[in-house]
Amino acid sequence: MGSAGLIEIKRRIKSVESTRKITNAMGLVATSKLRKTRKELFINKKFFEETEKIIEKLASTISQDDDSIYFKSNKSKYKLYILVSSDTGLCGSYNNTVVSYLDSLVRDEKENIKVITVGSKGLSYVKRIGLDTIADYVDIPDIPTVKEVKIVFESALKMYKDGEVSEINVAYLDFVSPVKQEPKAEKLLPIEKITSVPEEFITEPNSEEVLNNALNIHLKGKFRNILLSAKCSEQSSRMTAMNGATQNANDILDNLNLKYNRIRQQIITQEISEIVGGAEAQK
């Protein structure tokens, strides 16, 4: 391999260096987004925990009878799963992991499962496991707001109120740490009966109405918590994938540079040998 080989290797080196710049930049962006989303998740968890305390106190003042839509199930044979996926790719096995987990949950009852996807990537993945979606929500921001939460949750709640589904569940990748994310499913409705020590206090207009309003706010807070956790997992997966790609690019560059220097050394050695040989022939 001569100078033509060196030109080809230099071209490949430039190509890999260009790719490395992109993956490194994407890794840095994912790291920054993860930091911001984790901060928002921490704040929302505090809100979620406080509403939970309020609900426990309110629940102690009334009888959680079968008239409440939040505690009462219905006779529908269908269960609803909200699948939280990503809108963009380059996040490793993030989408495949959560969809495979959903598949394992519903494998024996797929004919009774309805799915709402959050994130454009979930739609194609869900079809691969033989499920159809009834609604798809895309372009969810990196930090989901109350607006997005309300749209998705109220759509699911309407199906539950109308008796179309007997359960509302959410399948997502729960954020444990930057190096650990676990697939998880949480049931939003119906809520299990709340047991707490009775307390005496006055509520206006009445305890039932206040509790129902509080439960609605609480469930939206819980759903936002899930979306934020899933977004953290997505950014963490993307950060890991991009860091891995950058390291692979570094390894390839090391090999290419070594190969380039070896060939260059061979060419120089050959040229020196030819010069020496020519000089010897002149004697």
From Swiss-Prot:
Cellular component GO terms held in the UniProt record: plasma membrane; proton-transporting ATP synthase complex
Subcellular location: Cell membrane
InterPro entries, alphabetized: ATP_synth_F1_ATPase_gsu, ATP_synth_F1_gsu, ATP_synth_F1_gsu_CS
Record keywords, A-Z: ATP synthesis, Cell membrane, CF(1), Hydrogen ion transport, Ion transport, Membrane, Transport
Top-rank taxon: Bacteria
Keyword check for Transport: yes
GO molecular function: ATP binding; proton-transporting ATP synthase activity, rotational mechanism
Alphabetical list of CDD domains matching this protein: F1-ATPase_gamma
GO biological process, one term: proton motive force-driven plasma membrane ATP synthesis
Membrane-topology annotation of the record: Peripheral membrane protein
Pfam families membership: ATP-synt
Family from the record: Belongs to the ATPase gamma chain family.
Oligomer and partners: F-type ATPases have 2 components, CF(1) - the catalytic core - and CF(0) - the membrane proton channel. CF(1) has five subunits: alpha(3), beta(3), gamma(1), delta(1), epsilon(1). CF(0) has three main subunits: a, b and c.
Described purpose of this protein according to its UniProt entry: Produces ATP from ADP in the presence of a proton gradient across the membrane. The gamma chain is believed to be important in regulating ATPase activity and the flow of protons through the CF(0) complex.
Record-linked PANTHER family: ATP SYNTHASE GAMMA CHAIN, ATP SYNTHASE SUBUNIT GAMMA, MITOCHONDRIAL
NCBIfam families, per database record: ATPsyn_F1gamma
Protein name, per record: ATP synthase gamma chain
Annotated source species: Clostridium botulinum (strain Eklund 17B / Type B)
